[in-house]
From Swiss-Prot:
NCBIfam families: S18. The gene is rpsR. This is Small ribosomal subunit protein bS18. Disulfide bonds: none annotated. Transmembrane segments: none annotated.
């Protein structure tokens, strides 16, 4: 079996850094073109970071910083 299947990804966000719902550019890295939140296995985030990311994206959607769905996609 190739070792690349089991290679651990490093988290793109440092463990101590907070995920801010007002930082739209950072949040856009973790959503698809259609506006869906990427799963943890693709983002490389820890479980806590993924929960915080989900909360931040949902807050940004509620206050209209991010769209719920992308009309172009």
């Amino acid at each position: 079996m190739p070792n690349s299947l089991f290679k651990k990804k490093l988290s793109p966000i440092k463990p101590g850094d907070p995920i801010d719902y007002k930082d739209v550019e950072t949040l856009k890295k973790f959503i698809t073109e259609r506006g869906k939140i990427l799963p943890r296995r693709l983002t490389g985030l820890t479980a806590k970071q993924q929960r915080d990311l989900t909360t931040a994206v949902k807050r940004a959607r509620i206050i209209a910083l991010l769209p719920f769905v992308n009309p172009e996609g």
